[in-house]
Amino acid sequence: MSEDRQSRSGDGNKILYCSFCGKSQREVRKLIAGPSVFICDECVELCNDIIREELEEKSQSARSSLPKPKEILEVLDQYVIGQQRAKRTLAVAVYNHYKRIESRHKNDDIELAKSNILLVGPTGSGKTLLAETLARLLNVPFTIADATTLTEAGYVGEDVENIIQKLLHKCDYDVEKAQHGIVYIDEIDKISRKSENPSITRDVSGEGVQQALLKLIEGTVASVPPQGGRKHPQQEFLQVDTKNILFICGGAFAGLDKVIQQRCNEVGGIGFGVKVKSSESKRDVGKVLAGVEPEDLIKFGLIPEFVGRLPVVATLDELDESALVKILTEPKNAITKQFKKLFEMENVELEFRQDALSAVARKALKRKTGARGLRTIVELVLLDTMYELPSQEGISKVVVDESVIENKSEPYLIYQTMPAKVASGE
C-alpha cells in the first residue's frame, strides 16, 4: 500500500507487493495497480469466488422461500372462490417468472423469456383479487393501473411510465424492490383499437397506448422522477429496469365470446345448411372464453405485438348464484365475516340466514356486478342498524333474512333477557 510494501531488488528496481495477501510481484502472475494500492490475480480470483458463493446462497435462499405452484394455489383458494383453471395457470406462470429471475444469476447459455399474463373474465369475477393475493403471498411491491387513463407521451393524461412511478411509491422508492414487483393493468380491453385495420388517424388512448406499453411490458429501462416529482430537463431520474417486473393485464373483453364462436363456426352464416341454435343451447360464456386464441384477441382490437408480449392467457368463468353465496361466506376475509367482526366489536352477534345469502347473490346477478357488488348490497341493508346500534343498549343479536335483503322488513333485533328483579322493578 505504502512505501513499506515496496523494496528494491539487487538491480535497484522497486519490488511491489499485493496490499491484500502480501505476496511480491515475483510470486504472482499479475499485480494490478490502483490509487496507492495493489492487488494480485490470486486475490482477484478469490474475490470472484466469494461473490459467486454469495450469489449462489442468495439464489438458494430465494428458491427455498419461493412457494411452489401447489402452495400458491392453496393460498389463492383461501381468498378466491372457484376459477380453478385461472388459478392453476397463474400459479405456474408466477412460479416460472420468479424462477427465471433466479436463473439470471447463473452462467447459463439459455435465457428464459419473460411471460406476462393476460386475465380475461367478466366484471367482478376476481381478476384484481387474484393479482393482489399473489403479490401479498410473494411479499413483493404491487400496484394497479387503469388502462383507460393512459395516453401516449405528449398527450393529456397519464404516461405509461407513471405506472412504474406508482410501483416505486409502494416500496418507498427502493429501485431494487420495485424491479421485482407486480403490476396489474386493469381495463386493458378498453384500449383496443376501433377496427382491425391499422388506423391512419392518431388513436392516443387505444392503439397508441398499446404501442407505448410494448417496451415497458417486454423490458426496458424507464426514467422516473424521484419521489413523485414532475419531469423537467435538469432533474436526475431514477432508472428502473422493467425486465423482471411481472405485468398482469386484465379485462372483461365484452363480446370476445362472439368473436371466438364466429371463428368456431358456431354462430352466424347464411343459407339452408346453417344450424339454428335455440337460446337453451347457448353455450356458457366462460367455456367459450376458455377456447380463446391470439387471433381472437387481435380481431377484438389488440395489436399483434401486444398480444405477443402476453403469452400466458388465463380465462375466468362468470360467477353463478352458488359461487356468489360461497364468496359471501367462505374466503378468509369473506364479506359476512367482516360484518360479523364489526358487530362483534359492539358485543352483538350478527346472523345471516341462508335465504338472505341467496337473495344477496340473486341481486348481484341481476345488477351484473359479479362479486364486486356483494358488499354494496350488504352495506345498504345494514346501514341503519350500524348507525343506531352504538347508541342502543341491551341488543345481543341482529338477524338478516331474505325479506330484509328484499327491503320488505328491517333487520331483526334480539334483546338480552333482563333479570327477574329488574323486570319486576325491585
From Swiss-Prot:
Residues in ClpX-type ZB domain copies: 6-59
Entry keyword annotation includes Metal-binding: yes
Top-level taxon: Bacteria
Entry's Gene Ontology BP terms: cell division; proteolysis involved in protein catabolic process
GO CC entries: HslUV protease complex
Matching NCBIfam families: clpX, PRK05342.1
Subunit details: Component of the ClpX-ClpP complex. Forms a hexameric ring that, in the presence of ATP, binds to fourteen ClpP subunits assembled into a disk-like structure with a central cavity, resembling the structure of eukaryotic proteasomes.
PANTHER family the UniProt entry points to: ATP-DEPENDENT CLP PROTEASE ATP-BINDING SUBUNIT CLPX-LIKE, MITOCHONDRIAL (PTHR48102:SF7), ATP-DEPENDENT CLP PROTEASE ATP-BINDING SUBUNIT CLPX-LIKE, MITOCHONDRIAL-RELATED (PTHR48102)
The protein, known as: ATP-dependent Clp protease ATP-binding subunit ClpX
Species annotation: Xylella fastidiosa (strain Temecula1 / ATCC 700964)
Gene symbol of the encoding locus: clpX
